[in-house]
Swiss-Prot record:
The gene is YME2. It is found in: Mitochondrion inner membrane. Plays a role in maintaining the mitochondrial genome and in controlling the mtDNA escape. Involved in the regulation of mtDNA nucleotide structure and number. May have a dispensable role in early maturation of pre-rRNA. Its main location: mitochondrion. Residues 176-267 form the RRM domain. It comes from Lodderomyces elongisporus (strain ATCC 11503 / CBS 2605 / JCM 1781 / NBRC 1676 / NRRL YB-4239) (Yeast). It comes from the Eukaryota. This is Mitochondrial escape protein 2.
Amino acid sequence: MMRLKILRASRINPALLRLRPPHLYSINKSQAFRFYATDIEDLKRQSDRTESDNSASTTGVIDKEANEVLLYYSFSNSRNFVKQYISRFLPSKFLGEQVEEKVKDVSYPLPQNSSITEVLHLPRDSGAFVKFKYSPSLTAKEFIQDIRSNIAESNTKRYSNIFMKAIGFVWDRSTQVYTVKGVPWIEDLKRFPSQKIGITYEGNPLTEEELYVLFRRYGLIDDIKVESTQSFVLFDTVRAAICAKHCITGMQLNGGKTTIHIQYVPVKKTNFIIEMISSHTKIALPIILALLATFAVLIFDPIREWFIQLKITRASHSFDEFKENKWFKIVYIPYKQLLNAVSSGYDYIDTQLHEVTGINNVDECLDDNQVLQEKNWESNMFWRERFEKAKQLKLWIMENIDTFIIVKGPQGSGKEEFVVDHTLMADAKLRKKVLLLECDELSKARSENSLIASTASQLGYFPVFTWTNSISQFIDLGLQGLTGQKSGLSESKETQIKNMFSLATQAIRSLTDGDYNKYKTNIEKKNRRLKDDEKIEVLRLEEFLAQHPESKPIIVINKFARKADVLSNDFIFPLIADWASGLIQNNIAHVVFTTADVGSLQHLNDALPNQVFKNISLSDASIASSKQYICDALKMKDTATLDDCIAPLGGRMLDLQAFIRRIKSGEDPLQAIDEMVNQAAELITTFFLHEHKFSNDDSNWNPSQVWLIMKLLSKKDVIDYDSLIKLPLFKQSKETLDTLSTLEKYDLVSLKREKGVLSKILTGRPLFTAAFENIISDVRIWKLYETQYLLNLVSLEVQKLTKFENELTTIYKINKLDGRIDYLSKKIDESNQKIVDYEKEIKDIAAYKGEPKQRHSFLGIF
């Protein structure tokens, strides 16, 4: 390192001499000045010859002339390292002006003939170097003492009240000033301040006592470490370390034999939490994951519960209540008036344009309101026929006695519209708290994440993080490989769905409790104004809910079924049934199920085995209502063209709406009905007569069984179950009931029961009756499936013959059962004769080329 050369002088601080023992200084008593400089100044002088900007911010060196003193101002005890880093990119001019004003505020008034010649702001260190020029009549010590007095007075005024003193105790922002004793190095490197400074020497090092005397004035010192070539001082605050570095670095001691250079040293702190985690992974990671899960529950579950309540009460209802707020009215009413004025102006302009151009916008208005009108037509037509049933549904809800209602009806019969639109939404009290669950959205979910997302959407469960499911499984797998045990973080989809419904139960309970608390508060307010003998008795929660059924939310579970479309989602329906039964048993909600699958009632029976369900059965609309509905929708007055079209459609809302859409698209009524019948026929042949597999265990019918039912229903509207089980392809067994239930599920047939026992079989959709006739009237299709049907009958008789012959062989060995032999011989003859007849019919069908002929077989089927 280059040796020091004396280039200029500065006065020694007498206070420093008093703090140090005399033997530490090799200075003569006659010597009034100490001299210090470095080769850096030579380098600066050489580099400044051709430069125009030689300021300290550019060169890092502060020049000082005679009668000038350099002080360091510290403004705050800041530990905000982010702020320190960002300060490097802030505009220095703006910050410098602010700092200069602050220096003047705390330092003024200056002694006479004194002034500030330069302010160098250090934003990273929350301080500044300030160079003063003082009067020759003053000494540097006297001038510095005046400055310190002004700053002390400013700090006293700043913290004069108790509030500011409390802030200052926590966050010291008082201004402090120190004399710069060394040669400061002005740098803006990414060396951020720390409590620890490193001291290197040029020359003889200092002892621990000398370092303490030198640095103690800047703040409390926690520790001092002295080494051969370097020493370290650990201050109690970062502010003290900053002041010490800027004031002492470059200082010469011992007659120029020792020069001090100071830099910040990052303090390496031990993080005991991280050390514990890294040392005890098997214990720490499960604890951390458990804490994170608990934290997530505490944060997100109240939010999700609020969103579920919002879903039940509906946003429109909440907005209506919010509009009653007086502050909202102050803002909303002027806005509404302005909006109406603007809208009226546009209407006037549009009217004038229409008068000039001759264009009328009446048709456009009609088109805009078309959807609303169609809903009104639907309500007017079908409401009359279902009015009494809607009254019954409302009555059951208002009775508030185990409100567990089942609305049954074929697919497309308008069960959802009947319950939600015509019954609940039409009542001002009941519509306030309604939650509609679409079960088919859940049963059709193909993946675990889509199932969770669909369930959350139906319940209003928000926020939901489906991606965490995959991450938790990945973490669980990693922890199992790392620690040898599972974290338990990942959950099955059954558990996750169950937790979502459990939270929905809490939200529903909160709604009922909220209404009860409002009631209780109102009664208590009234009782404060009444005498003791006039006070109103506060009802218990159960009594309140019994008298106020509208306080309990109405849960509508739509399209409830026996099995899900996706086999892995079959747990959904039993889970929903158990959840609904819990709501009823806890008396916190009304539950209404809508279903077209009678087999789904088994889930409800399992969930509430001792409960008697209230049932409402919906059927198709009458022909007259269907005809009027179509005429109103199509704006037709001449109904003669519709007479032949309505009969195949019956009163099924789904088919009526499809027919109306076809007519509006430009099809002729007869053409439209023919296309619908052909599509239905294609659906039947594709899915029922070709052994189409809906799922692994759902296609339990034989195409010949479907063909037989089609032929019977094409001739008459109803089949007696007792007559059906006498036919060869059917028998009184569980298999027959399962087959018919499956066909009912897919809407091919409709089953009627009397006192819970199957009695009648009808066509599932009225349109299917015409489709049956369409299929049977096609000679090619009739020959195909009729032959297949007869071959199945032949197979049945062959099986019987084999059975009889085997039994005869066994009996002949005994040789003592002549009566049984005669019986079996007659049965063999009958089966043999049937086979002959069936084969003859098969030959006749193969040779037949005309229309399907009416045959009267000995079975009495045709």
